Amino acid sequence: MAAPWVSLRLVAPMWNGTRGIHRLGGAVVPEGNQKKERKMLQFLNNHFYDVEALRGYLLQREMSKVHLKNRSFTWLEEQHGPYSAGAFFILKQGGAVKFRDKEWIRPDKYGHFSPEFWNFREVPVEAVDASDCEINYEGLDNLLLLKELQSLSLQRCPHVDDWCLSRLYPLADSLQELSLAGCPRVSERGLACLHHLQNLRRLDISDLPAVSNPGLTQILVEEMLPNCQVVGVDWAEGLKLGPEERPQDTASPVPA
């Protein structure tokens, strides 16, 4: 942000022999007011600088936290196998996992969860609910360990973007259900990357603000994945003509 000195349009002071500042308009600013102006300008300058510095610091701190949450758990994979390592990553993010023939495992409101999943070293994870989690591109390394994953929910994940979707192809043989509802950074380009997932049976693409034409996008996705039920979008959404695009009837009215 530019310092407020310019916006106030100060001009160079000129001395006219009196105590004060003589401006170009001819008015003399008393010395007391001059000091007040300088203090105010200094305060504004310091204030704006501090806000920018604080904003940058908070942003950097938040990104560091996201990076830490998405670090690789290779050491866990080596000790406990890919299923337990992948499950631990999701549970630490606040998500839930379901091992084959087991009940869902979810963290409580304090983030604590049962350690029993460490005993499921040889049991595949068949479903993951990562809704509202801070998974990003790097964190997918831990999720892609789950080669038998059948159901994946990434609803409202703020860091899931088009690049993330381009990495899901290793799950093509197993993944049958995928929800991307409410992901703010997913656009048509990312959805086009899902053509690898030909075993999908259900895909939720509702509430994607980065998709410019939801109706047309759903039609194209349905053609790309003919065996998949695409839900969440009214097929006519984005295809209806607005008032300014509708043809005007210029014919003369028929007399009664």
From Swiss-Prot:
Q: Spell out the GO cellular component terms annotated for this protein, sorted alphabetically and separated by semicolons.
A: mitochondrion
State where it is primarily located: mitochondrion
Which cell locations does it reside in?
Mitochondrion
GO terms in the biological process aspect are:
mitochondrial respiratory chain complex I assembly
Q: Where is the signal peptide?
A: none
According to the UniProt entry, which residues carry Phosphoserine? 252
Please give the InterPro entries that the UniProt record associates with this protein: LRR_dom_sf
The entry's keywords: Mitochondrion, Phosphoprotein
Record's Gene3D superfamilies? Ribonuclease Inhibitor
What role does this protein play? Answer: Required for the assembly of the mitochondrial NADH:ubiquinone oxidoreductase complex (complex I). Involved in the assembly of the distal region of complex I.
Can you tell me which family this protein belongs to?
A: Belongs to the ATP synthase subunit s family.
Q: How does it assemble?
A: Interacts with incompletely assembled mitochondrial NADH:ubiquinone oxidoreductase complex (complex I).
Name this protein carries in UniProt: Distal membrane-arm assembly complex protein 2
Native species: Macaca fascicularis
Q: What is the lineage of its organism?
A: Eukaryota, Metazoa, Chordata, Craniata, Vertebrata
